[in-house]
Amino acid sequence: MNKKIVLLLIGIAVFIGCGKKVKVPPKEDINKTVEQNITIMEEPIVEPELDIFDWQQNDEVFSEGIANKIVVVKSKRVAVLFDEDGNMLSRHRISLGEHPVGAKREAGDKKTPEGVYHIVDIRRDPKYYKEILISYPNREDIEASKALGVNPGGGITFHSQVPWNWDGHGDDYTLSHDWTIGCMAMTNKGMDNVWDSVNTDTIVEIRE
């Protein structure tokens, strides 16, 4: 056969072969391949960091020492005692006045004060076991109440539980709501610890 004819036939065969359609895999197979190649990155769940005033169930802290300051955070229902170096001595869950939001301004408003005070008296009480009287009203409280034309009241204390709960069996119930006339109530066990830690030099700071 003529050499030119042979080369022509080979070229035609190659051309026809290259012109064949490429077989496309089904859409389902493509999706499966893509899904297999995707790596899903899951973000770790970050728990909020608790600070010293965050209360968790049954984490009341007791220790011995002289308290330089008691800090009450009303919104967290907690009282924390600190020594003169700022170290935590103890932490206690508390109940507030029946109307806990806002600072006390008037006698009978059943609000717990907000401000800086000091301890005036430490005494036993037939109704509340033991109590610690603070220096409410201070100068700012008196001026604020005077501007409103009202009596600021007084007699605000830290106190413990009523007689039926002196053994502590009802602590979970009493501490689950605010029930005082403006005072700060804690467990009898907590009061025993605070009682041994404070004196009339102890500062009381009550925050919102």
Whereabouts are the PLM-identified features?
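Positively charged n-region of N-terminal signal peptides that target proteins for export
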Residues: M1-I5, K20
